Design a protein with these regions (language model features):
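Classical N-terminal secretory signal peptides
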Residues: 1-2, 151
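Alpha-helical solenoid scaffolds in large eukaryotic transport, assembly, and signaling factors
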Residues: 2, 9-107
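Eukaryote-biased recognition of C-terminal alpha-helical segments
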Residues: 109-151
Length: 151
């Protein structure tokens, strides 16, 4: 289940990396609601921050993408760059499964249905294949990688 509590200082476990420190400075102490405008306007930057976050912050702030990409949400209706946001979400899942599976596996059940929906509704997200590639093909990779991590 996705973490519903704003991460605290000990959850960030810096390990002395600049990437985590930058993510901390941008996200620390902020709610999902507070971060939605940033993720909506800068999905590629948000991807970069979330990709390097430790488990608890990642498991909390991934909700910004989930909320933004839910086609029934107001945030989705207001998002100007749905294609980039959807591509970043799918790519972020792929990155975490490949590089930090321990961060994402506990919440994969909460993410996989949205990932599948996005992959089968690429046009809804205004994501041209020529620009973003094939979401169905990326979803196949995600499913395979998820299965491999669970074995």
């Amino acid at each position: 289940m996705i973490n519903q509590t704003i991460p605290e200082d000990p959850d960030w476990s810096f390990y002395g990396t600049w990437d985590i420190e930058f993510a901390y400075e941008k996200f620390h102490g902020k709610s999902v609601d507070e971060m939605l405008p940033f993720v909506s306007s800068c999905p590629t930057s948000a991807y970069g921050y979330l990709a390097e976050m430790p488990a608890k912050p990642f498991q909390y702030y991934i909700q910004t993408f989930v909320r933004l990409l839910d086609p029934t949400s107001l945030e989705f209706a207001e998002c100007d760059d749905k294609g980039s946001a959807a591509s970043c979400f799918l790519s972020l899942i792929d990155y975490k499964l490949k590089n930090q599976p321990e961060c994402i596996l506990p919440i994969m059940d909460d993410l996989i249905e949205l990932a599948k929906f996005i992959s089968t509704h690429q046009s809804l997200y205004e994501a041209k294949i020529e620009i973003f590639g094939s979401f169905p093909e990326l979803f196949e990779v995600l499913e395979r990688r998820n299965r491999e991590c669970l074995e």
